[in-house]
Amino acid sequence: MFREGQTAQVLDTPFFDFIALAKALQPKVVIAENVKGLLMGNAIDYVRRIYKDFEDAGYYCQHFLLDASKMGVPQMRNRVFFVCIRHDLGVNFLKVSDLFNVEPHISMDFNEPGICYGEFADYMGKPYGKRMKEMFDNRTHGDIDMSNAYRKLTGKRGFFNQCYLYEDEICNTLTAHSDSAIPFKKPVYLSTAEVCNISTFPQDYDFCGFSPHYICGMSVPPVMMAQVATRVYEQWLSKL
């Protein structure tokens, strides 16, 4: 079980059904992604199975842990990408990757300059209710979240998930909850425009009645996906 946007996820049949579909269709390249937790603890057994199933499907498989904040996304968000190329095509790019493996070479190193919240902050979001406003009024510069103010007011522990956004810092991972990332400067939630910027969604995106926080918090940023796809095209597909 893994977590993305504070929602538990289980890697089960849909992921492996996707690999089975790739086996049937045999596209030149297959790209899949999942949460960082996939590489931790016992979950690594799933990674081994993913590699085996892609191998059986006729693909070389590699995985990369990528940070969106280094890819032109104003958000620190880690995702695991599985980048696979069909055996008959991958032989054109084989390179020794370590002492034991030969893999089709592709660089997934990114070092784009970070984009801080202050570059697009508009403070046009919904104002806080009474309880959130009270904790906001008891904040201290340097607070990471609302937990210090909550402890000051109640003597209890809590509100660790309401993380402050400073103008000179990059946003932490945006989750599906509207209070997961909140401006330190003003007592308002993030506006729709700010949420779209943080997740690199179009400003005119139609959320079809769903919360922008929910959709963006549960999605891989489009610019992050575009960066991976561009590398695949430039280093593999354009050379075939």
Region annotations inferred by a language model:
Residues 1-240:
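Conserved active-site and SAM-binding loop architecture
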